[in-house]
Every structure is written in structure tokens, then in C-alpha cells.
């Protein structure tokens, strides 16, 4: 079966699988081969960003959604004039909208630069310092853990086993007296 050529329904020629059920290197049918070839790596630097849904992972669902009703509320019986309430709503909403845009225009790029540098340093330290230190610690602690385990099995296990045997014959009988 190996080495033969097959023609699929579209008339395309492809090589036969190594064995009937296929393997990870050479799948047994064309659809599996197509699935394996479809997997592409996407570069994070060239992917397109969504300009409509700017919070696809919902990071700010609970914290930043502040509307007029979340900040200013008049209880029953204490209401201002309707025109004042509408003007206050419009003023709050427009001010928040444009001031956020102004702050984003002034500080958005510098803050993105600062946070990019910060997370680059954090990633660098995690990859090149933290994980190697933890791995080194785990390797070095194995020696101590073996010695500790031997000491526990030598001294503590017999002691606690003896204490367990002593108290294994203790019987308690409870009676309710009325």
C-alpha cells in the first residue's frame, strides 16, 4: 500500500498513506492533510485590529462602564427641573466623551509605550530569570527532600505507628442517661 498514488474525487493526485490509519506525519486521507496544511501561524505584529469591538476579552465590563445614571441620581421626591436634568445628562456625557478622547490623544501613545516597555521587561524577567530560578530551586531541593523523606521514614513513621497501635485498642462507649 505504501508508495502508491491515489486520485481523489476532484481528479488530484496525492500519495498513499504510510499505513491504513495514517500517522501524524502523513495522514490517511486528503481532508486530514488539508486540515494540517490549513493551520497557519499568525504574527501578532501584522494582525488587524477591530476598530468596533475594542474590548474583545471584556476586560473593562465591571469597572469602567460609568454612565450618568451610575454617578448622579435624584431620589423620589427630590427632582430638579426636567431641563436641568437633561442639560446635566448631556453635559456629563459629552464632557466625559471628549475629555477621554483628549486624554487619549495626549497620553495614549506615551502610556502605550510605557506599558509596552513594562510588559516587555516583565516578560523578559519571567522567561530569563524567574522560571530558570524556580527550575534550579526544584532541582536543588530534590536532594534535601530525599534526605527529609528518609528522616521521616526512619524516625517519625515508627513512632506514629507505635502510637497508632497503642490507641487502636481504646474503645469508647457512650450512653445517654435520661
UniProtKB/Swiss-Prot annotation:
Chain spans, region Required for homooligomerization: 2-94
Bilayer topology annotation: Peripheral membrane protein
InterPro entries xref list: Caveolin, Caveolin_CS
Keywords of the record: Acetylation, Cell membrane, Golgi apparatus, Isopeptide bond, Lipoprotein, Membrane, Palmitate, Phosphoprotein, Ubl conjugation
Similarity comment: Belongs to the caveolin family.
Intramembrane residue spans: 105-125
Localisation: Golgi apparatus membrane; Cell membrane; Membrane, Caveola; Membrane raft
Modified residues (Phosphotyrosine): 6, 14, 25
Cross-link Glycyl lysine isopeptide (Lys-Gly) (interchain with G-Cter in ubiquitin) mapped to chain: 5, 26, 30, 39, 47, 57
PROSITE patterns: CAVEOLIN
Signal peptide: none
Protein name listed in UniProt: Caveolin-1
Region annotated Interacts with SPRY1, SPRY2, SPRY3 and SPRY4, chain positions: 131-142, 167-178
GO molecular function: molecular adaptor activity; oxysterol binding; protein kinase binding; transmembrane transporter binding
Gene symbol of the encoding locus: CAV1
Modified residues (N6-acetyllysine): 5
Lipidation (S-palmitoyl cysteine): 133, 143, 156
Post-translational events: Phosphorylated at Tyr-14 by ABL1 in response to oxidative stress. Ubiquitinated. Undergo monoubiquitination and multi- and/or polyubiquitination. Monoubiquitination of N-terminal lysines promotes integration in a ternary complex with UBXN6 and VCP which promotes oligomeric CAV1 targeting to lysosomes for degradation. Ubiquitinated by ZNRF1; leading to degradation and modulation of the TLR4-mediated immune response.
GO biological process: one example: regulation of cytosolic calcium ion concentration
Amino acid at each position: 500500500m505504501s508508495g502508491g498514488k491515489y486520485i481523489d474525487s476532484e481528479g488530484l493526485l496525492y500519495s498513499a498513506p504510510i499505513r491504513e490509519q495514517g500517522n501524524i506525519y502523513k495522514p490517511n486521507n486528503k481532508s486530514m492533510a488539508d486540515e494540517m496544511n490549513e493551520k497557519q501561524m499568525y504574527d501578532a505584529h501584522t494582525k488587524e485590529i477591530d476598530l468596533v469591538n475594542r474590548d474583545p476579552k471584556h476586560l473593562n465590563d465591571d469597572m469602567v462602564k460609568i454612565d450618568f445614571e451610575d454617578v448622579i441620581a435624584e431620589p423620589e421626591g427630590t427632582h430638579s427641573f426636567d431641563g436641568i436634568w437633561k442639560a446635566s445628562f448631556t453635559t456629563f456625557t459629552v464632557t466625559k466623551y471628549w475629555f477621554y478622547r483628549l486624554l487619549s490623544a495626549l497620553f495614549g501613545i506615551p502610556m502605550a509605550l510605557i506599558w509596552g516597555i513594562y510588559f516587555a521587561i516583565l516578560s523578559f524577567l519571567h522567561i530569563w530569570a524567574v522560571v530558570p530560578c524556580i527550575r534550579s530551586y526544584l532541582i536543588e531541593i530534590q536532594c534535601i527532600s530525599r534526605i527529609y523523606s528518609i528522616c521521616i521514614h526512619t524516625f517519625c513513621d515508627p513512632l506514629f505507628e507505635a502510637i497508632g497501635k497503642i490507641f487502636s485498642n481504646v474503645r469508647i462507649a457512650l450512653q445517654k442517661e435520661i
